[in-house]
């Protein structure tokens, strides 16, 4: 049974499918808010919000599962295509403003467009290779796991390395967390009510990935608060000096 084709789902899953679809819409809403917010924040702060490698991996995954192996669920199709469309804007903003973050590394700064292109191409072929190896239904989920972990770890590392909240906000963090949490919720429904195709979601590696996502994304909020407080304390100190 192909777990990617909802029409083949057992009656138990079809009974809870409307609930699963709500979580799919929640996933889409969270990520669309995140993407639009990143574009806004990028132009506001003149930087990029998502780390380079996670961004390239993410847009490559969306290309594969929006255009090459589209879901048979119209709701998922709509969510993925909308996400890909807006993510192109995220990529544009990143390419436009990334050189300002790499002035300390001229070789990288001068070749960022090529780096974005090659990284996206590399991840695109990687997602396709994974689909050829284990089938696109499984690769869809495992590829998403890789994207999520790269995004979570990359986002936290970027925040700490910059020592600044430029390109970031609580809205971006919470919308990303909403989108990813809704993904976990509808995947859980598939595991519980469609075990013929999704029993593997209870595997140690999936559970480890879930724990890592929750730990890192939860830590991001705390670290963002700390960095923001540090920025505010610097502004207050500068204000006192100017007086």
Swiss-Prot record:
It is a multi-pass membrane protein. Keywords: Glycoprotein, Lyase, Membrane, Transmembrane, Transmembrane helix. It comes from Penicillium crustosum (Blue mold fungus). Glycans are attached at residue 111. GO terms for cellular component: membrane. Its EC number is 4.2.3.-. Pathway: Secondary metabolite biosynthesis. The keyword Metal-binding does not apply. This is Terpene cyclase penB. Belongs to the paxB family. Pfam families: Pyr4-TMTC. Terpene cyclase; part of the gene cluster that mediates the biosynthesis of the indole diterpenes penitrems. The geranylgeranyl diphosphate (GGPP) synthase penG catalyzes the first step in penitrem biosynthesis via conversion of farnesyl pyrophosphate and isopentyl pyrophosphate into geranylgeranyl pyrophosphate (GGPP). Condensation of indole-3-glycerol phosphate with GGPP by the prenyl transferase penC then forms 3-geranylgeranylindole (3-GGI). The lineage of its organism: Eukaryota, Fungi, Dikarya, Ascomycota, Pezizomycotina.
């Amino acid at each position: 049974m192909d777990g990617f084709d909802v029409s083949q789902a057992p009656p138990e899953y079809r009974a809870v499918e409307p609930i699963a679809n709500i979580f799919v819409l929640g996933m889409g809403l969270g990520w669309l808010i995140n993407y639009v917010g990143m574009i806004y924040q990028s132009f506001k702060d003149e930087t990029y919000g998502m780390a380079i490698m996670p961004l390239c991996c993410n847009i490559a995954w969306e290309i594969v599962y929006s255009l090459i192996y589209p879901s048979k669920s119209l709701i998922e199709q709509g969510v993925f295509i909308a996400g890909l469309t807006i993510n192109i804007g995220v990529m544009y903003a990143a390419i436009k403003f990334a050189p300002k973050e790499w002035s300390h590394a001229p070789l990288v700064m001068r070749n960022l467009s090529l780096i974005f292109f090659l990284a996206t191409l590399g991840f695109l072929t990687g997602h396709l290779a994974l689909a050829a190896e284990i089938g696109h239904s499984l690769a869809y989920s495992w590829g998403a796991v890789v994207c999520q972990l790269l995004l979570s770890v990359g986002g936290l590392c970027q925040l700490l390395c910059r020592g600044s909240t430029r390109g970031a906000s609580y809205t971006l963090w919470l919308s990303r967390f909403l989108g990813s949490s809704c993904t976990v919720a509808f995947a859980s429904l598939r595991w519980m009510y469609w075990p013929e195709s999704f029993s593997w979601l209870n595997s140690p590696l999936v559970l480890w990935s879930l724990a890592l996502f929750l730990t890192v994304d939860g830590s991001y909020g705390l670290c963002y608060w700390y960095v923001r407080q540090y920025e505010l304390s610097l502004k207050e100190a500068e204000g006192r000096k100017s007086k």
